[in-house]
């Protein structure tokens, strides 16, 4: 999960839509932008989805403004089971993803990124 506090002038953050287009993420003062990781999709049975995102030189706003990013990445223990949270299932609904360990999930993501490159 990434939580961003952005100014209106900073711009440049884009998210990819399900149909493959890149769109600017609109921000307002006092609001946060939250990007979720792929494991959150599995935990929530796609109620919360991971969005591919990128940062580009802004077309509007102050492209020369200063930015500061602090990344902090947290990952469950390698052998932790990742499965749908029961409260994310409606009556009669089944999980869309099989249970997997966090380590196996990350291994598959790394393999997929190498195949795509």
Model-based region annotation:
Residues 1-117:
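C-terminal flanking tails of non-heme Fe-dependent oxygenases
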């Amino acid at each position: 999960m990434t939580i961003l506090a952005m100014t209106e002038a900073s711009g440049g953050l884009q998210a990819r839509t399900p149909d493959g287009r890149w769109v600017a993420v609109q921000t307002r003062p006092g609001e946060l932008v939250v990007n979720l990781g792929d494991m959150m999709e599995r935990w929530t049975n796609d109620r919360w989805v991971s969005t591919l995102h990128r940062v580009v030189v802004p077309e509007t706003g102050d492209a020369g403004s200063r930015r500061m990013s602090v990344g902090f990445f947290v990952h469950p223990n390698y052998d932790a089971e990742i499965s749908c949270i029961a409260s994310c299932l409606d009556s009669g609904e089944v999980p869309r993803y099989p249970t997997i360990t966090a380590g196996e999930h990350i291994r598959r993501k790394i393999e997929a990124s190498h195949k795509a490159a």
